[in-house]
């Protein structure tokens, strides 16, 4: 028994060392950065009314997200041109920009990420949750986005959708006596960009 005891004592230590090595090998990169391409990123919106559904688009000005894979702490900004709203109807779009968004006074719509939950797989599909602040029409509101992500090489694609209760957030409802519209706008984003993982 005295001969076997040193070997038995060494086994837990060896196991712990192997486990630590495995965890370190499997650990994700310390920092993940995603830079969006405005030309490949599409932002659409949908607003329902009593007669039909109005659909339109916005243009991304710039977008980047960086986050620490260990802590989830995030930074960056996704910036949308508020004056780029386009539904294909000039009169309606002019009213939206002037009376609802007041884009001359509030030219940008901004999402600022604060925390990311989940892990971006190196060459696969994954889903993360991005919690942050959404600023529109001079007001800032908490917003969490669920983002399915696909990575191919250093290229990344992601999509998400969420609702903006614009009337509740202080913007004017453009309804008239004879035409009532919803007080919530649905936003859909199909984003594409470049992924960089930094150790």
Regions found by a protein language model. Name each.
Residues 14-24:
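Bacterial N-terminal signal peptides
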């Amino acid at each position: 028994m005295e001969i076997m005891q040193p070997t038995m004592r060494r086994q837990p230590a060896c196991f712990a060392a192997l486990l630590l090595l495995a965890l370190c090998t499997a650990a994700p990169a310390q920092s993940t950065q995603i830079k969006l391409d405005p030309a490949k990123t599409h932002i659409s919106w949908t607003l329902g009314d009593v007669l039909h559904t109005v659909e339109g688009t916005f243009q991304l000005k710039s977008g980047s997200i960086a986050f620490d894979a260990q802590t989830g702490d995030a930074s960056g900004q996704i910036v949308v041109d508020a004056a780029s709203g386009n539904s294909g109807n000039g009169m309606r779009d002019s009213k939206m920009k002037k009376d609802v968004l007041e884009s001359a006074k509030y030219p940008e719509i901004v999402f600022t990420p604060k925390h990311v939950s989940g892990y971006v797989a190196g060459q696969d599909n994954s889903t993360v949750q991005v919690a942050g602040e959404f600023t529109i029409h001079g007001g800032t509101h908490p917003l969490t986005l669920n983002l399915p992500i696909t990575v191919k090489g250093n290229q990344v694609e992601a999509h998400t959708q969420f609702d903006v209760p614009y009337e509740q957030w202080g913007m004017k409802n453009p309804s008239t006596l004879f035409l009532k519209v919803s007080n919530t706008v649905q936003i859909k984003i199909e984003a594409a960009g470049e992924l960089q993982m930094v150790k």
